[in-house]
From Swiss-Prot:
<feature type="binding site">
    <location>
        <position position="108"/>
    </location>
    <ligand>
        <name>NAD(+)</name>
    </ligand>
</feature>
<feature type="binding site">
    <location>
        <position position="165"/>
    </location>
    <ligand>
        <name>substrate</name>
    </ligand>
</feature>
<dbReference type="GO" id="GO:0006099">
    <property type="term" value="P:tricarboxylic acid cycle"/>
</dbReference>
<feature type="binding site">
    <location>
        <begin position="14"/>
        <end position="20"/>
    </location>
    <ligand>
        <name>NAD(+)</name>
    </ligand>
</feature>
<protein>
    <recommendedName>
        <fullName>Malate dehydrogenase</fullName>
        <ecNumber>1.1.1.37</ecNumber>
    </recommendedName>
</protein>
<feature type="binding site">
    <location>
        <position position="134"/>
    </location>
    <ligand>
        <name>substrate</name>
    </ligand>
</feature>
<dbReference type="GO" id="GO:0030060">
    <property type="term" value="F:L-malate dehydrogenase (NAD+) activity"/>
</dbReference>
<dbReference type="InterPro" id="IPR001236">
    <property type="entry name" value="Lactate/malate_DH_N"/>
</dbReference>
<dbReference type="InterPro" id="IPR001557">
    <property type="entry name" value="L-lactate/malate_DH"/>
</dbReference>
<dbReference type="InterPro" id="IPR010945">
    <property type="entry name" value="Malate_DH_type2"/>
</dbReference>
<dbReference type="InterPro" id="IPR036291">
    <property type="entry name" value="NAD(P)-bd_dom_sf"/>
</dbReference>
<keyword id="KW-0560">Oxidoreductase</keyword>
<comment type="function">
    <text>Catalyzes the reversible oxidation of malate to oxaloacetate.</text>
</comment>
<feature type="binding site">
    <location>
        <position position="95"/>
    </location>
    <ligand>
        <name>substrate</name>
    </ligand>
</feature>
<dbReference type="InterPro" id="IPR022383">
    <property type="entry name" value="Lactate/malate_DH_C"/>
</dbReference>
<comment type="similarity">
    <text>Belongs to the LDH/MDH superfamily. MDH type 2 family.</text>
</comment>
<feature type="binding site">
    <location>
        <position position="101"/>
    </location>
    <ligand>
        <name>substrate</name>
    </ligand>
</feature>
Amino acid sequence: MAQSPPPAVVTVTGAAGSIGYASLFRIAAGEMLGPDTPIRLRLLEIPSAVSAAEGTAMELDDSAFPLLRDIEVHDDPKRGFDGTDVALLIGSRPRSKGMERGDLLAANGQIFTVQGRALNQVAADGVRVLVVGNPANTNALVAANNAPDIPAERFTALTRLDHNRAIAQLARHSGAAVKDIRRVAIWGNHSSTQYPDIFHARVGDRSGAEFAADREWLTGDFIPTVANRGSAIIEARGASSAASAANAAIDHVHDWVLGTPDDDWTSVALPSTGAYGVPEGLVSSFPVRSVDGSWQIVDGLEIDDFSRKLIDASVGELESERDAVRGMGFI
């Protein structure tokens, strides 16, 4: 009988929140790391939310997942991240009414400085980190800069939700099935400045460029619908995307660990290598493939003037966020 692999330690911050709740049961069921990998869950919360996280842990116990070896609940990052193989950093300070952008960056800069340092001290050698909490790109930048012993490319931010949204919108417009759409790309920030790119996509046996040629639809419908989808969901349901964000986080880690299909790629925000003119070190979204457990930016894509302008605008926003947190001493 084949021996099962050693258990993977998975830490989820903001575990009592709605995205955490929507993620944890699917992780415990094996949807993120595959059907053969046992899971040890670490739920990390702020002290005031520990009781709620303990309630979630009780529900996880009651689900009797065969892969779930144990669950711990912590409010101390050093204990919550001890030996972690995969860290989903979902918890962050949300923007409250009247809050200035600088205040938001400062509040989250403190959170992700602490978490980056704790990961640096106690996480497993091969730790993979996914930042979901917004502003995700810059929070990932702060965490990575405070974890100098962990390779920077192990810190990523979630743009798979935007990627999935783009696939869904292109499927709706083209009449194709979601499964037949490949090679969509998200560039830049996980914000309304992001650029969902279909010029290199495949829609069944058709080129995404065919659909991009309809500039009225592209600029008046597709791009703004994808870029502003989060706001539209808040407006409609009175709460932010939770299940779809959890789904995207699971997709992201699944593909990171288990690989992307040979004929497709996905979108991930990760520290730039200088590719496509994005300043080195800036955490920006790119089209990527997962090869042997590591992300590789897809190279050689032709970027026309239309795309270049949109990529540069989003990168400019990321540079201003980076400069702000640098000025605050977080990086």
